Amino acid sequence: EVDSLWYDKHAKEVLRKSEEEYGWVYKTNHANNSTEGQIVLDTVKKEGIINYTVWSDVFICPTCGEEIIFTEVQKSSENLRDAFICSRCSRKLKKGECERAKEYVYDELLRQTTEIAKQVPVLINYSYNGKKYEKKPDAEDIRKIEEIAGMSLPYKVPFIKLPEGYNTNQPRKSHGIKYLHQFYTKRNLYVISVVYNNLAKYDTPERQTLTFTFEQILMGMSKIARYVP
């Protein structure tokens, strides 16, 4: 049995301490929707808090080699169901006909460069002044993502190789994911390490409950979380 007052107090404490360390990674410039996502120019910088970022898979057109951002062609090809048009050569394609674009990234935990399926940020949902907004990632968002990608994790995170099996072979084959930490973007992995570190400071039986609560959101932070407009 958990003392509810203790839980409430220390859960908020973990969040507060964690946000002091990682809060900046989820900040984004507020955009004026009336100007089609252009950044609001003001003497006072307006920043919102990111709720989530939508990442899109990238495919290669087998005819012309153009990189195709899947969510963008889905929007422009709504009447074609599972088919879409290459913006460069105009060929009508299906997802299964295209190879995934790949990229090489340095994996800090593996201490080596690894090949993974390329994904790019296409939408940011954020809160500003009590309201939710959506925008395309701007130059500052991209710069911040790249900055975090080059940073070292401040604390340890679980390092677990995926076991062989039907469900684990799917992400291994489609996205090159072979380890648990590869399910997360560097930004989310950074935050996970901070929160786990703050949870580890509690040497009490209640720590298990706090940790369990945090772990319930890990699936939603992963690359396999589906975006439903």
Q: Where is each model-derived feature located?
A:
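Nucleic-acid modification enzymes, centered on SAM-dependent nucleic-acid methyltransferases
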Residues: 1-229
